[in-house]
């Protein structure tokens, strides 16, 4: 990173963390740059910046305003893979949004060193990582002790979030512990607990919370292993299919039946489409064990 560029951004009013981010990007040479891009430069145009910034796609990506009339600063959350149903996609989108609002509202700090992020990134690529692997997470000093945070956080969260005097700031935790909490005195209460406290603080109407709860329940069940990941579900489907010969070759029949099961699973995941799915059953035939397999929530742990 160009330290002079970092200092220039700080002198312009940018905070150190954001200056680190942009200086590390702008210090690199662009992949493509034409002579026209360098002509008639002025502070009101963002074309050159977009050229430099457009080739960097981090997991969490800042999107600065493109003009005074367009949308303001935006943040893209990019690491999530596509889910099998709209309901599952909506669940992760809702959870990410509510957690982001809670972090901002309560001034929470979940920063961890980038080398630990990379180590966790390697762990999460392993098979059945949700249940079998552990990931680095900030276990201590993540909750502010300021009067501001004490006023905004509900009493249950304050009692659970007492700062530890001993122990490492960062620790290895399972996905279940990160999402649902460690379940021990003084342990991390879980990101879902923080989201619920945010909803309490915002005095979310009961009707809205009833609408949100099924989505948050999916996040809880996915982290605990009650609900399988799409990868686990697909592996289980293939292994149990009568045409799979345990030879690592997935033939067209297995793929076709899986896609039909996914469509049926999508229909069953939404109550609005449930009646349509039943009516269409005679035109969309499944073998019974495929339907049961598509709807089951449990898979073999060794898959």
Label every PLM stretch briefly.
Residues 1-302:
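C-terminal accessory/tail domains of diverse enzymes
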């Amino acid at each position: 990173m160009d330290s002079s560029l970092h200092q220039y951004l700080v002198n312009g009013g940018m905070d150190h963390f954001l200056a680190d981010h942009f200086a590390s990007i702008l210090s690199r040479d662009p992949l493509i740059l034409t002579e026209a891009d360098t002509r008639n430069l002025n502070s009101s145009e963002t074309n050159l910046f977009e050229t430099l910034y457009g080739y960097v796609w981090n997991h969490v990506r800042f999107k600065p305003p493109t003009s005074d009339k367009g949308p303001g600063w935006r943040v893209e959350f990019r690491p999530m893979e596509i889910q099998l149903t709209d309901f599952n996609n909506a669940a992760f989108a809702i959870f990410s949004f509510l957690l982001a609002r809670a972090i901002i509202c309560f001034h929470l700090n979940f920063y961890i060193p980038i080398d630990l992020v990379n180590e966790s990134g390697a762990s999460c690529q392993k098979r059945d990582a949700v249940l079998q692997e552990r990931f680095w997470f900030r276990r201590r000093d993540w909750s502010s002790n300021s009067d501001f945070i004490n006023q905004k956080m509900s009493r249950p969260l304050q009692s659970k979030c007492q700062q530890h005097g001993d122990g490492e700031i960062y620790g290895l935790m399972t996905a279940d512990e990160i999402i649902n909490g460690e379940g021990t005195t003084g342990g991390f209460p879980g990101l879902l607990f923080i989201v619920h406290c945010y909803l309490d603080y915002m005095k979310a109407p009961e009707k809205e919370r009833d609408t949100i709860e099924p989505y948050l329940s999916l996040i809880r069940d996915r982290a605990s292993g009650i609900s399988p990941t799409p990868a686990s579900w697909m592996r289980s489907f293939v292994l149990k299919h009568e045409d799979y010969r345990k030879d690592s070759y997935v033939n067209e029949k297995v793929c076709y039946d899986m896609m039909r099961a996914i469509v049926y699973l999508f229909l069953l995941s939404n109550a609005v489409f449930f009646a349509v799915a039943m009516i269409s059953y005679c035109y969309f035939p499944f073998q019974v064990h495929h339907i049961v397999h598509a709807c089951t929530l449990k898979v073999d742990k060794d898959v």
